[in-house]
Amino acid sequence: MEELSQALASSFSVSQELNSTAAPHPRLCQYKSKYSSLEQSERRRQLLELQKSKRLDYVNHARRLAEDDWTGMESGEEENKKDEEEMDIDPSKKLPKRYANQLMLSEWLIDVPSDLGQEWIVVVCPVGKRALIVASRGSTSAYTKSGYCVNRFSSLLPGGNRRNSTTAKDYTILDCIYSEVNQTYYVLDVMCWRGHPFYDCQTDFRFYWMHSKLPEEEGLGEKTKINPFKFVGLKNFPCTPESLCEVLSMDFPFEVDGLLFYHKQTHYSPGSTPLVGWLRPYMVSDILGVAVPAGPLTTKPEYAGHQLQQIIEHKRSQEDTKEKLTHKASENGHYELEHLSTPKLRNPPHSSESLMDN
């Protein structure tokens, strides 16, 4: 335990927020065992099949988030409270549950999809912190992935200020990345717009809707008294080799953190999913086998070899049996992406045994 504590202390930046995006990504050995039992490609196939029959009540789910109305949920919370009392959990360490784990998170793109160029789209992401944005009843709230409300302000989102919140049904829920440097919420995805939920809609439609509706809200992309933070939609691009090369040669109005790859048919499902993949820009050449132009985005940092080696070893290990995979996961470590933003380490790891900055 002491060795583990020392390793964590040396690699994770200090933060009071659980799973803070100010901390580096978990190392490979923290990859959950349930993600080791099946290949990433197989889990993608199963999830696409599952979402065809899985129809959750997202209308009420979105309404609860917007109105902070959890009537009827108390019984389940009471059962959880009893379980926590039996486990003797410190009340001060319990997390807010209602707004926690509401964002769809990615996994490292390990198994390259055979239909990448046809069925996937890519979004270039800025350095920042993931945020759940809820605009309702004349106010806009920003929550962390862990469910903490970190800010309340007015915005020009539907339902986000007292002027445009004409009815209780005018609420909006967005998945964003907040850039403190640019004082901007970059919109990744839309879960609800003017009271209409989009959880069960495919990614390509959600993105189309988002980029159609955001420009209609005049002044949303400007910083004003009634809209103190800009809201800007992140563009998406095809995943063909030609498109990826063009994207990686572009200039962006923000510091680029990485690339999110979305399957076009993916519904918005809170939690980690293999239907959304994550790569740093310099990984595209090695992982996807795409020739990329030389430039700032594709320049490999000193620690790049360690990250790539772990991912490539994972791909090779999938030729082994399930038992060997599970053993290798605990030995060499395989991981899923719990954070989006990745701050730079002052002293990048130079040992394969050190924690990775991913």
UniProtKB/Swiss-Prot annotation:
List residues modified as Phosphoserine: S75, S351
State where the protein is found: Nucleus; Cytoplasm
Q: Which GO terms describe its cellular component?
A: cytosol; NLS-dependent protein nuclear import complex; nucleoplasm; nucleus; plasma membrane
Q: Which SUPFAM superfamilies did the record assign?
A: DNA ligase/mRNA capping enzyme, catalytic domain
Q: Name one GO molecular function term.
A: nuclear import signal receptor activity
Q: Which residues carry this modification: N-acetylmethionine?
A: M1
Q: Where is the composition biased (Basic and acidic residues)?
A: 315-341
Q: What are the start and end residues of every segment in region (Disordered)?
A: 1-26, 69-90, 315-358
Q: Where is the composition biased (Polar residues)?
A: 7-22, 349-358
Chain segments carrying region Necessary for interaction with XPO1: 1-160
Record-linked Gene3D superfamilies: DNA ligase/mRNA capping enzyme
Q: This protein is called what?
A: Snurportin-1
Supply the source organism's classification.
Eukaryota, Metazoa, Chordata, Craniata, Vertebrata
